[in-house]
């Protein structure tokens, strides 16, 4: 099915003349090679790397200056929106955003308890086969030695090449290394920083992004840096005269709160700088995986330039395209030219092509409330998710949030320990595996799509997922069965082949019988979470 889809798209593209618009290299100095900046060329040249299909689990350090306040996601936007809890926290903790802005939060990012080697070792024990570092989020600070963006982590905050240090630690441990780029959205995401309080004693007083220019930094910690480069310029600025929080929120939602993939019309240089920053990132750190926080690719043809550059560089590095580029909400044809990522979501069917879901045990950026109220995903929930995703031909990219100092908290350590314990016996059903004929069975229905985790119902002992590995069939129980358990998909007459042995991973052989109703297995009581069995026999796989 995959080959047919690829051929069909390429034939249609040729008929429409789409391929002829491609260029071998751009005027931006992107890498030359066979891959051109067009969808037909991406599709024609791309093949999913075996290492990615084998890896199954990646760990992600979604870590940057927005972790400093320990309030969760999108602090750099919501701190500028009066009435939001993050605005109130900022006002009490750091001061009014007309004086203390996001640039000052970035200055407070210390990373003084960050031990990358120890964290990588812990993540690897928990099953990670690849590791991803956040390179730049919507707050527009490059967390690496950026050639084209002065607001970077060597000049601001920890004064370290965060991505470079992560990269060395990951590769030393033998992990594949990835980076995530979220910067394409900074130009509209940051616009509340140009606003003001619509009510209260500071009513109408513009925030720091509106007021400050490079010359204002003389004698300040940010001397020599231009705040407009960080805050991206006023592209959708709150107009004067709004006098209620409700009206302010409505204006922001309508004018700069949309998730769009175009650049600012009046500032094409912003898009040019984005491409320079992206190609610089890829050239410096040679990532095995690049995560784009975008629907397909950002900025239309410029995103295609970035993709072609990355693939051509991979050919220079490896002699072939041996890297992964992910995007979201891909059209069917695009899934043959890059890898689909489903953020905080599920799929309800077995995919023909590899894909990835990314999620976090808590908020993307560290939120201390998750520690205090113990609301992280448990190790059991993580492994349930992993089994479901892998059975459907996917990978799981899991974020373990860190506070600004770079540590992880005690509850996160427990979750990683739980994952480590499960991997010791269950890993053979996951790593290097491939899907079976069907992904599984059970009563729990999952709603497909991104950003829908909260709609998911708890799994039961009847929810079972299948994988295959080295000629064996595996069944993973998402709940905790006890006593005689029936796998209906393995009923005599429904499958060909003969079952000779059933073994509990981490245990021993189990009694079983097979009839027209299913495979009946005597499971021990007091199982650990997500017990997995290996099913051996002839003609099963």
Question: Which functions belong to the PLM regions below?
Answer:
Residues 1-16:
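N-terminal secretory signal peptides and thylakoid transit peptides that target proteins
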Residues 11, 27-541:
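Mature catalytic domains of secreted/periplasmic carbohydrate-active enzymes
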């Amino acid at each position: 099915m995959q080959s047919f889809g690829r051929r069909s798209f390429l034939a249609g593209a040729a008929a429409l003349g789409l391929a002829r618009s491609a260029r071998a290299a751009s005027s931006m100095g992107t890498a030359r090679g066979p891959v051109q900046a067009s969808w037909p060329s991406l599709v024609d040249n791309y093949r999913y790397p075996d290492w990615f299909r084998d890896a199954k689990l990646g760990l992600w350090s979604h870590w940057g200056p927005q972790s400093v306040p320990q309030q969760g996601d999108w602090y750099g936007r919501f701190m500028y929106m009066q009435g939001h809890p993050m605005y109130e926290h900022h006002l009490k903790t750091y001061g009014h955003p007309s004086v203390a802005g996001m640039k000052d939060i970035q200055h407070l990012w210390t990373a003084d308890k960050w031990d990358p080697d120890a964290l990588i070792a812990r993540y690897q024990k928990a099953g990670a086969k690849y590791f991803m570092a956040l390179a730049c989020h919507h707050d527009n600070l490059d967390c690496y030695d950026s050639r084209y963006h002065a607001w970077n982590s060597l000049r601001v905050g920890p004064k370290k090449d965060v991505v470079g240090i992560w990269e060395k630690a990951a590769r030393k441990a033998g992990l594949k290394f990835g980076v995530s780029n979220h910067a394409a959205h900074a130009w509209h995401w940051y616009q509340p920083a140009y606003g003001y309080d619509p009510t209260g004693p500071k009513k109408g007083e513009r925030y720091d992004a509106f007021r400050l220019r490079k010359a204002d930094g003389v004698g300040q910690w940010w001397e020599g840096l231009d705040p407009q480069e960080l805050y991206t310029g006023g592209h959708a600025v709150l107009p004067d005269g709004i006098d209620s929080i409700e009206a302010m929120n409505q204006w922001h939602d309508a004018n700069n709160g949309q998730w769009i993939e175009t650049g600012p019309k009046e500032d094409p240089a912003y898009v040019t700088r984005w491409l320079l920053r992206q190609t610089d990132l890829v050239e410096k750190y040679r990532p095995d995986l690049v995560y784009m926080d975008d629907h397909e690719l950002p900025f239309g043809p410029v995103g295609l330039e970035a993709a072609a550059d990355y693939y051509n560089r991979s050919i220079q590095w490896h002699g072939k395209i041996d890297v992964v580029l992910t995007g979201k909400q891909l059209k069917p044809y695009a899934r043959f030219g890059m890898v689909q990522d489903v953020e905080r979501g599920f799929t309800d069917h077995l995919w023909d092509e590899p894909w990835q879901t990314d999620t976090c045990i808590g908020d993307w950026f560290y939120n201390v409330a998750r520690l205090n109220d113990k609301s992280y995903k448990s190790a059991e929930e993580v492994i349930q998710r992993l089994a479901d995703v892998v059975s459907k031909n996917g990978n799981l990219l899991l974020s373990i949030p860190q506070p600004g100092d770079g540590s992880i908290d005690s509850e996160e350590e427990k979750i990683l320990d739980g994952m480590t314990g499960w991997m010791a016996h269950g890993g053979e059903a996951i790593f290097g595996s491939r899907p079976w004929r069907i992904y599984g069975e059970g009563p729990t229905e999952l709603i497909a799509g991104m950003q829908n985790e909260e709609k998911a119902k708890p799994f039961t002992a009847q929810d079972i997922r299948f994988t295959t590995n080295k000629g064996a069939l595996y069944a993973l129980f998402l709940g905790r069965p006890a006593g005689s358990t029936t796998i209906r998909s393995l009923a005599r007459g429904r499958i060909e082949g003969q079952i000779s042995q059933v073994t509990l991973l981490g245990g021993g052989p189990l009694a079983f019988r097979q009839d027209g109703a299913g495979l009946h297995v005597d499971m021990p009581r007091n199982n650990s979470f997500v017990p997995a069995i290996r099913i051996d026999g002839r003609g099963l796989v």
